[in-house]
Amino acid sequence: MAFLLHQARFYTTVNHLRDLPPTVQPEIAFAGRSNAGKSTAINVLCNQKRLAFASKTPGRTQHINYFSVGPAAEPVANLVDLPGYGYAEVPGAAKAHWEMLLSSYLATRSQLCGLILMMDSRRPLTDLDRRMIEWFAPTGKPIHTLLTKCDKLTRQESINALRNTQKGLDAYRDQGVKGKLTVQLFSALKRTGLDEAHELIESWLRPSVADEKSEPVAQ
């Protein structure tokens, strides 16, 4: 099966909200703690080895990377790689910059149609993960969580991580959050959950295609 995400290429890098590209195509943002495997997951989803780069120093990257998706002449969407968060040794000024950049982008970017939130399956729903949800959830747009590195868990541990994370996400619905909050297991190494993630992301980028597939055929 050919995936739209496999037609991805670097587009631009920005460090301030004023530099965000004036595009009209839908965007999907990828967020997660430093060392949650975000860059690796993006590369696997896009079937490329070096599309998204992970800094050798956790927490060093402070900018937003854009990747265009679709035909090079007429891209149909953008993937947006947000800075990793949660590394303790990052200076306070850098943390403040990240917080402003991430919270403002998530809350105000009209092109943004959904958030892919990476959580280490061994340590899901940290305080900072919850903060990301709370910044974005008021928009009513969907959040899909990838519980990364699930290959490091036993089968029972994976089941428990999935169940407990879904329970934590359901609590936001009880608080009145309108957008969909979903979760799945994911392993870039073992390619666990890859097809499921592909299908969900592409349904966000190409809802008209998904709608057409779901419509009954006229007799």
UniProtKB/Swiss-Prot annotation:
Keyword Transcription regulation assigned: no
Chain sites annotated for binding GTP: 32-39, 59-63, 81-84, 148-151, 186-188
Gene3D superfamilies tied to this protein: P-loop containing nucleotide triphosphate hydrolases (3.40.50.300)
Binding site for Mg(2+): S39, T61
GO biological process, one term: division septum assembly
Molecular-function annotations in GO: GTP binding; metal ion binding
PROSITE patterns: G_ENGB (PS51706)
GO cellular component: cytosol
Cofactor(s) named in the record: Mg(2+)
SUPFAM superfamilies the UniProt entry points to: P-loop containing nucleoside triphosphate hydrolases
Disulfide bond positions: none
Listed NCBIfam families: GTPase_YsxC (TIGR03598)
Family the entry assigns: Belongs to the TRAFAC class TrmE-Era-EngA-EngB-Septin-like GTPase superfamily. EngB GTPase family.
Physiological role: Necessary for normal cell division and for the maintenance of normal septation.
Name of the molecule in the record: Probable GTP-binding protein EngB
Organism: Burkholderia cenocepacia (strain HI2424)
Recorded name of the encoding gene: engB
